[in-house]
A protein has these predicted regions:
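Short, well-ordered coil↔helix boundary/capping segments
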Residues: 51-59, 75
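Conserved short "hinge" loops at termini or chain/domain junctions
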Residues: 1-52, 83, 87-109
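Short, hydrophobic/amphipathic alpha-helical patches that form generic packing surfaces
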Residues: 58-72
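Charged, low-complexity interaction regions
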Residues: 18, 71-77
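Catalytic-loop motifs flanking and including active-site residues across diverse enzymes
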Residues: 3-6, 57-61
C-alpha cells in the first residue's frame, strides 16, 4: 500500500475530502513516525510503497487518523483512534513472540 492510499483512507475516516500540499507533507512525516514506532520502513514520497502487510498498513492508517484528530482538535475521535491504534500496535508487535517452556540442565538444578 502506498502512502497516498493510507492518507486517503485516513482522510475518508475523518470525512475530509480535500487534501493539499501542506497536508501531504504532514502526512509523510506522520506516516514515517508511525512506521518507525511499528518497526517499519520510512517513505520519502506518498507514491512510495510502505508495506504489503495488510495488518501493518491498517495500523499505520489508524495511527495517521489518530494524528490528524489531534491536529483538528477532535478529542472524542482522538480517544477512539488512540485506543484502536494501541490495540493494533500491540497485536502487530507481539505477532512474532513465542513463549517456550525450558527445564534447567546440568548443575543449575
Amino acid at each position: 500500500m502506498t502512502g497516498y492510499e493510507i492518507l486517503k483512507k485516513a482522510l475518508l475516516r475523518l470525512g475530509i475530502k480535500n487534501d493539499n500540499n501542506a497536508l501531504n507533507l504532514r502526512a509523510i512525516e506522520y506516516i514515517n513516525q508511525i512506521s518507525s514506532d511499528l518497526r517499519g520502513n520510512a517513505i520519502e514520497n506518498l507514491s512510495d510503497t510502505l508495506s504489503t502487510n495488510g495488518e501493518f498498513c491498517e495500523a499505520v492508517t489508524v495511527g495517521l487518523t489518530m494524528m490528524f484528530t489531534l491536529t483538528v482538535g477532535d478529542s472524542a475521535a482522538n480517544k477512539i483512534y488512540t485506543d484502536l491504534y494501541n490495540a493494533k500496535r500491540a497485536k502487530l508487535l507481539s505477532a512474532g513472540d513465542t513463549v517456550e517452556d525450558k527445564l534447567p540442565k546440568g548443575d543449575s538444578l
